[in-house]
UniProtKB/Swiss-Prot annotation:
PROSITE patterns: PUR_PYR_PR_TRANSFER. It comes from Methanosalsum zhilinae (strain DSM 4017 / NBRC 107636 / OCM 62 / WeN5) (Methanohalophilus zhilinae). The gene is hpt. One of its GO terms (cellular component) is cytoplasm. One of its GO terms (molecular function) is guanine phosphoribosyltransferase activity. It is found in: Cytoplasm. It comes from the Archaea. Belongs to the purine/pyrimidine phosphoribosyltransferase family. Archaeal HPRT subfamily. It catalyses: IMP + diphosphate = hypoxanthine + 5-phospho-alpha-D-ribose 1-diphosphate; GMP + diphosphate = guanine + 5-phospho-alpha-D-ribose 1-diphosphate. This is Hypoxanthine/guanine phosphoribosyltransferase.
Length: 190
């Protein structure tokens, strides 16, 4: 399982920005090309791995949208996209986001107290976005049934677990100089 994701990661280009090495990948960046077969493989794995007994699928714009949309289409579960733009709708939840590389506000709409949600993201690196999202939703009376990210890089998922948030990832990677090293791949035997 996840052969295409594995192959696409180990062949992903790496670019240097200052002292930090970024891998460029279709799931995290939308370039060079996000193949439907890759989305299919990822979504099928998440369907086997995640608690899908939920009222809503939630993702943060922008790159969580393709995977979350695929899951929504496969399951018929409505999708709520956490936006970087305020809409001033009734019940809108505002949260302050801080990651290793940006700060800003995020806005949640279309979710109500008592809803059960699956949160889906493309990459966890620092875990900052998911931490504030989970806490804000819980404070609003929303039950987090599961949190799944496609790619894990860095210590963010460990930091989330230390904060009491059980997060699942499909692959764990690190960047070693100019290449992506896949350290762990989800197995359906887990």
């Amino acid at each position: 399982m996840l052969e295409q994701l594995y192959d696409s990661l180990v062949n992903a280009p790496v670019v240097k920005r200052g002292d930090y090495s970024y891998f460029i990948h279709p799931v995290s960046d939308g370039v060079p090309l996000l193949e439907p077969s890759l989305l299919e493989e990822i979504s099928e794995c998440i369907l086997c791995y995640a608690d899908m007994d939920v009222d809503r699928i939630v993702t943060v714009e922008a790159m969580g949208i393709p995977v979350a949309t695929c899951l929504s289409l496969k399951t018929g579960i409505p999708l709520s996209i956490v936006r970087k733009r305020k809409y001033d709708l009734a019940g809108e939840i505002e949260l302050s986001q801080s990651t290793g590389y940006s700060k800003g506000k995020l806005y949640v709409n279309g979710i109500s107290e008592g809803d059960r949600v699956l949160i889906v993201d493309d990459v966890i690196s620092t875990g900052g976005t998911l931490l504030v999202l989970v806490k804000a939703l819980e404070d609003a009376g929303i039950k987090i049934s599961d949190v799944v990210a496609v790619i894990e890089r860095g210590t963010g998922s460990n930091d989330l677990r230390d904060a009491g948030i059980d997060v699942k990832t499909l692959v764990r990677v690190e960047v070693d100089d100019d290449r992506v090293v896949v350290e762990e791949v989800y197995s359906d035997n887990e």
